Structure formats: structure tokens, C-alpha cells
């Protein structure tokens, strides 16, 4: 959900997302796989795919980097929780997946959550 939001908001607003069944031989020609084992844009070094996309596309917005840290905590095993929003984000995204009829609907619904998270973090950063 977060990766799709990041791609559409900050890389390619016209991006289309395909969901390939596990074990399928390969992604269609021209498709960039992400968030799957072995993909260039996936989990690396204890960081989530969102983090990999921010790094790969050289996105310098500090709020996006903060969201990457939040998702790292929500999406990967962490010994210590630093980002207080991580567990809430994880719970909300799980609920969206459970109540959505398919992955594309979940992406659309999740975009509102990530828009709201981004806006709240921007507002919070202005106070500092």
C-alpha cells in the first residue's frame, strides 16, 4: 500500500499496478517488480521496500524518509520501537486489506491513509 502511494505521488502518477500470482515465471515486459523477494525494489538490509524506493529514486523529502522509518518498524522485525505511528499504521493497513475486495481497491483506500500520514508529519515538522 505504502509503496503504491509513494510511486503514484512522487514518481509516476500514472503508474499501473499488476498483481502476479506467486510462482509465476516473470513479470510482464516493461513491468518493474517490487516488494517481492529478489526484486531490486524490495526488502534489503532490514529495510522495507518503501525505503528501497526512496533511496533508488533519490527522493530527498525528509517526510518521506520519516515515513520509510515508520514503515520499516511496521513491516520488519525491530528490537526497539522508535516511531510511535508504526503499530497504528500496521493495524490500519491490515484492516484495509481485510475489508477490501481486492488489492487494487486496497491500494486506493490506503492512499488516503498515506496522504493523511504525510500531511500530519508535515504539520508536526512545522512546529519544530
Feature-to-residue mapping (PLM):
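Polyanion-binding interface signature
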Residues: 1-81
